[in-house]
């Protein structure tokens, strides 16, 4: 998982835009830039500082893992 923090206080908002995504490909280009392809991603606007942001991310990851486990348990055939 790749996390990018974009402070919005420069725009007068005072919040942080957190972008998270999975990186598929990273390669240099002819113009000395880097091309990054993302398989999926999303944005969250948060007011908390970085420590609280990572706490929110961890909670979201734990919730996703729990939901996946429940889904797998429901797909197991009963004898």
PLM ranges: what are they?
Residues 1-17, 21-79:
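Eukaryotic intrinsically disordered, low-complexity regulatory linkers and tails enriched in Ser/Thr/Pro
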